[in-house]
């Protein structure tokens, strides 16, 4: 076995299998595990997926939302133990693989059309 096959074999046991199919433009709710003091809770973070990077265990999504007039982006490792769950709230119809142009838009210009041909 070569090195890449060994790494892939080791990584495969850490991959999550219960992830929904996520596309760029979708609005998702990500449950993030937060530890405060001695307690652990799940904090939801809802926003639009503006970028995806595939790469096995290093697969990430960038989620953007506007909070109190300020744009906030977070990058989530999909297979991380910190990510409790991911739920697709609505499907978006876009023609780009990366939606970085939304950073320069304000208000109603950031809206994305809804897609009805994919189930939520």
From Swiss-Prot:
<keyword id="KW-0687">Ribonucleoprotein</keyword>
<dbReference type="GO" id="GO:0022625">
    <property type="term" value="C:cytosolic large ribosomal subunit"/>
</dbReference>
<dbReference type="GO" id="GO:0003735">
    <property type="term" value="F:structural constituent of ribosome"/>
</dbReference>
<comment type="similarity">
    <text>Belongs to the bacterial ribosomal protein bL19 family.</text>
</comment>
<dbReference type="InterPro" id="IPR018257">
    <property type="entry name" value="Ribosomal_bL19_CS"/>
</dbReference>
<keyword id="KW-0689">Ribosomal protein</keyword>
<dbReference type="InterPro" id="IPR038657">
    <property type="entry name" value="Ribosomal_bL19_sf"/>
</dbReference>
<dbReference type="InterPro" id="IPR008991">
    <property type="entry name" value="Translation_prot_SH3-like_sf"/>
</dbReference>
<comment type="function">
    <text>This protein is located at the 30S-50S ribosomal subunit interface and may play a role in the structure and function of the aminoacyl-tRNA binding site.</text>
</comment>
<protein>
    <recommendedName>
        <fullName>Large ribosomal subunit protein bL19</fullName>
    </recommendedName>
</protein>
<dbReference type="GO" id="GO:0006412">
    <property type="term" value="P:translation"/>
</dbReference>
<dbReference type="Pfam" id="PF01245">
    <property type="entry name" value="Ribosomal_L19"/>
</dbReference>
<dbReference type="InterPro" id="IPR001857">
    <property type="entry name" value="Ribosomal_bL19"/>
</dbReference>
